[in-house]
């Protein structure tokens, strides 16, 4: 959870999201509590009444992600999300966001071209929706991971 005083001090900065065409929700996937962080941000976006803005989830630090070891012979311990592989997280979040998630390592430059192309594609979608006869300003590109 984000401390309340921190949220209050950044309220004016956060109000800028009202003007944004696209939100990039950057998440540190290597942090053990990253899902709680996502929930906190989503609550804040709901408070600001911008939870329905187009959003691209950006899961960063894939190079640092380590799943907790799981012993399949242990009959007491259930396998939880802390044991998910990076691939399992990708499948989970691609499903939850209907494909609006990218997994990158900014430090290692992994998947950065894909990230740039997805941002371009999302902005292009917004532009074409608003200005249907100006689609030539944003030529279509191939987006492959």
Regions found by a protein language model. Give the residues of each.
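Inter-motif core of Ras-like GTPase G domains
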Residues: 6-31, 43-50, 105
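Conserved structured catalytic cores and adjacent interaction surfaces
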Residues: 2
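C-terminal-of-GTPase-core extension/linker across diverse P-loop GTPases
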Residues: 32, 36, 40-145
């Amino acid at each position: 959870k984000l401390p309340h005083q921190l949220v209050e001090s950044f309220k004016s900065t956060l109000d800028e999201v009202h003007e944004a065409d696209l939100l990039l929700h950057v998440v540190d996937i290597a942090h053990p509590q990253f899902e709680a962080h996502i929930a906190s941000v989503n609550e804040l976006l709901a408070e600001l009444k911008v939870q329905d803005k187009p959003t691209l989830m950006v899961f960063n630090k894939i190079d640092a992600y380590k799943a907790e070891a799981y012993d399949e012979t242990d009959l007491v311990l259930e396998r939880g999300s802390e044991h998910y592989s990076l691939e399992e997280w990708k499948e989970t979040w691609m499903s939850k966001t209907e494909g609006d998630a990218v997994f990158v390592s900014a430090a290692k430059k992994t998947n950065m071209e894909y990230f740039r192309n997805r941002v371009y594609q999302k902005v292009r979608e917004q532009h074409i929706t608003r200005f249907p006869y100006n689609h030539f300003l944003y030529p279509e590109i191939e987006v492959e991971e």
